[in-house]
């Protein structure tokens, strides 16, 4: 889910669930020239086609083979409330993707299964340490003393 500068409510990730992920990966490489990056700790492979959205490939366990589209949400809990109040159903509640964000899976009233994705807040840049701030103050003082001579 890299490079997700899309706006909320956009499709930002496509996930393929395959009964034979190695065969699917070979097929997509051979036909479309896609490159995959394996994420062994998640039993997952990421891909980035020539244009967005990118996606992932995983073994279809406890689910049929197919495609799951992820929609960017600013607030998954609020979006899930809207989904249920409009006749949809939560299939999988909000869960963390360590280091990336959160996701949840839902169905619309007709049975279409989709997912939500919420990014982790980006850490703020570190403020200057006291040592750096002291050096900066010393440089400014030195410059001003040169000017006053």
Where are these regions (language model features)?
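N-terminal beta-strand motif that seeds the catalytic metal site of vicinal oxygen chelate
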Residues: 1-25, 52, 67-69, 119-149
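Tryptophan-centric aromatic hotspots in well-structured domains and transmembrane helices
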Residues: 13-14, 27, 32-38, 102, ...
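Short beta-strand micro-motifs in enzyme catalytic cores
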Residues: 12, 43-45, 67-69, 100-104
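Conserved short beta-strand elements that form part of the metal-binding/catalytic scaffold
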Residues: 33-66, 113-118
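Short glycine/proline-centered loop/turn elements that form peptide/ligand docking sites
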Residues: 40-44, 96, 123-124
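Residue-level hotspots at or immediately adjacent to binding/recognition sites across diverse folds
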Residues: 13, 21-24, 32, 48, ...
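Vicinal oxygen chelate
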Residues: 20, 71-113
């Amino acid at each position: 889910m890299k490079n997700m500068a899309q706006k909320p409510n956009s499709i930002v990730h496509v996930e393929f669930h395959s009964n034979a992920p190695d065969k699917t990966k070979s097929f997509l490489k051979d036909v479309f020239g896609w490159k995959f990056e394996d994420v062994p700790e998640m039993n997952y492979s990421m891909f980035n086609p020539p244009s967005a959205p990118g996606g992932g490939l995983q073994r279809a366990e406890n689910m049929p083979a197919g495609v799951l589209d992820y929609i960017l949400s600013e607030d998954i809990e609020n979006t899930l409330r809207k989904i249920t109040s409009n006749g949809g159903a939560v299939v999988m509640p909000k869960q963390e993707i360590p280091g990336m964000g959160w996701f949840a899976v839902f169905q619309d009233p007709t049975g279409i299964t989709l997912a939500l994705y919420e990014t982790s807040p980006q850490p703020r840049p570190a403020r200057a340490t006291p040592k750096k701030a002291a050096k900066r103050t010393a440089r400014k003082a030195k410059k001003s003393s040169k000017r006053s001579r």
